[in-house]
Regions:
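Non-catalytic, mobile gating and regulatory segments of ester bond hydrolases
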Residues: 1-147, 151-275
Length: 275
């Protein structure tokens, strides 16, 4: 449970191990398996402080800038042909993060009727000006990819939608971000290049609920089952009696949220596939 709540406490983890033998595919049409691993590693590494994270991104061939604004943090990692923007997820000892997560009323996102989570929108808009400046300096010759875990996954989705330059988006263990109008419009633009990984019964991916609030997920579901296999099939809907039993296993559902677990499972899926 410690690494769920405090991922950076995992001092033994080696980020991007084997990255030079398994290079990123900057021109891939969407989130290929190897790109999924690179993006998951970036999402995981976003929990580490900049004095460590920047060196580890560099070990994989990326020069990185750290951006922070009132508790919202992201890394902009630049290689010769691509850029990865990775957002840090919720830190339970950060009051602003918890406050952002808790404000789940839907608020307007654009003029087309799309609405999004109030706290997520405000968190994104705190960091948006600095991130926009950083991306503008990079020009247009590199493909841009967004990633994040938990709250970070929600911010990655909002960033892709707002900036409109996403070659690919990865969310791991992400909550729902907006209403049906937002999801429909987002998927029309980026659904084919957005991978939404869900580990087994990760509790965070089920909130905010569809009813009565009207939230919907975006992107292509990539479900990781209890054996670590990845497919597009969601877990079966449980009968009422099974739901009660599952409530007693809340700790298991929280353990499914661990970002390291996502990165390892995504790597294993890539390694098994051979592509």
């Amino acid at each position: 449970m410690r690494f769920v709540l405090h991922p950076a406490a995992d001092a033994a983890y080696v980020h991007y191990e084997g990255s030079h033998a398994n290079p990123f595919e900057p021109g891939a049409a969407g989130v290929s398996r190897v790109n999924g691993w690179w993006l998951a590693e970036a999402a995981l590494l976003s929990y580490w402080p900049p004095d460590i994270a920047i060196a580890r991104f560099r070990s994989a061939g990326m020069e990185t800038a750290f951006i922070e604004q009132r508790g919202v943090q992201c890394y902009v990692s630049v290689a010769s042909a691509f850029v990865i923007v990775s957002f840090r997820g919720t830190e339970v000892n950060d009051f602003q993060d918890v406050f952002d997560d808790a404000r789940f009323a839907l608020v307007r996102w654009n003029e087309a009727g799309a609405k999004v989570h109030h706290g997520f929108r405000e968190a994104f808009e705190r960091i948006e000006p600095q991130l926009a400046d950083a991306l503008a300096l990079l020009g247009s010759e590199r493909t841009i990819w967004f990633s994040g875990h938990s709250l970070g996954g929600a911010l990655a989705v909002l960033a892709a939608d707002r900036f409109g330059r996403a070659h690919g988006v990865l969310s791991i263990g992400s909550p729902r971000v907006g209403n049906a109008a937002f999801a429909t419009a987002f998927d029309a633009r980026f659904g084919a290049v957005t991978a939404r990984y869900v580990s087994n019964r990760d509790l965070v991916t089920r909130v905010p609920p569809r009813r009565p609030f009207g939230y919907e997920h975006v992107g292509e579901l990539r479900q990781i089952d209890v054996e670590g296999d990845v497919s597009g099939a969601a877990p079966p809907v449980l009968a009422p009696a099974e739901r009660i039993k599952e409530l007693a296993r809340t700790q298991d559902a929280l353990l499914d949220h661990m970002p390291r677990g996502y990165s390892v499972d995504i790597w294993n899926d890539y390694a098994r596939s051979g592509d």
